A protein has these predicted regions:
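Conserved beta-hairpin
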Residues: 35-54, 67-68
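Catalytic cores of nucleotide-enabled group-transfer and carboxylate-activating enzymes in metabolic
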Residues: 120, 146-147
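Conserved acetyl-CoA-binding loop-helix of GNAT-fold acetyltransferases
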Residues: 104-118
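A short, internal acetyl-CoA/4′-phosphopantetheine-binding micro-motif in the GNAT/acyltransferase core
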Residues: 94-104
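Short amphipathic alpha-helix that is part of the acyltransferase structural core
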Residues: 1-29, 33, 38-40
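C-terminal "cap" of GNAT-fold acetyltransferases
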Residues: 127-138, 146, 152-170
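Conserved acyl-donor/pantetheine-binding loop and adjacent beta-alpha core of acyl/acetyltransferases
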Residues: 52-95
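Short hydrophobic/aromatic beta-strand element in the GNAT-like acyltransferase core
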Residues: 36-40, 50, 90, 95, ...
Length: 170
């Protein structure tokens, strides 16, 4: 269910203050400002999970180390040479959270698959080749299991890692 400005938001606790706070305090403002759209997964009137999406792009910088060139070549491997660009269209998963009492039931994986299907369907008005995420360290294994790859090695010591999924691989 898409969050609208008049959608009531019941209590939600995924165990992460930032993710809880986004849903409670920021999601409607992001919608109003046209920065992101949040989708709720509900059982009866209880929010069990949510994710938010915004458009993004995978961009090649002009200064690349050899390792980054290798990573960028992996991104473009399935794109014909004549169609390769410096920026590829993407959708970013800005937030994804599952309430604590529903963790471990595969809801996160189902949300990732729903995002994939949303952008593989013919209902979208713009091209979108990749899904991106700035994954918390605690979620790196989750995204890895869902076939996301690291975009760079520069963020190995950061709190989040840039990751991508190629929709063409589905």
């Amino acid at each position: 269910m898409r969050l609208e400005e008049d959608t009531p938001i019941s209590s939600f606790d995924c165990g992460d203050i930032d993710l809880n706070g986004f849903l409670q305090n920021d999601a409607k403002n992001y919608l109003k400002s046209m920065l992101a759209v949040t989708y709720l997964i509900k059982v009866e009137n209880e929010i069990v999970a949510y994710f938010c999406l915004s458009y993004d792009g995978l961009t090649r910088t002009n200064i690349l180390t050899e390792e980054e060139k290798t990573l960028w070549n992996k991104v473009g491997r399935n794109i014909p040479n004549s169609k390769r660009r410096k920026t590829y269209p993407a959708v970013k998963i800005g937030r994804l959270a599952v309430a604590k009492q529903f963790a471990g039931f595969g809801i996160g994986r189902h949300m990732i698959n729903a995002v994939k299907m949303m952008y593989l369907s013919e209902q979208h008005h713009a091209g979108c080749r990749f899904i991106t995420v700035d994954a918390y360290r605690s979620a790196l294994d989750f995204y890895g299991k869902n076939r996301f790859r690291y975009l760079t090695t520069k963020d190995e010591c950061e709190d989040t890692r840039a990751m991508y999924f190629d929709l063409k691989s589905v």
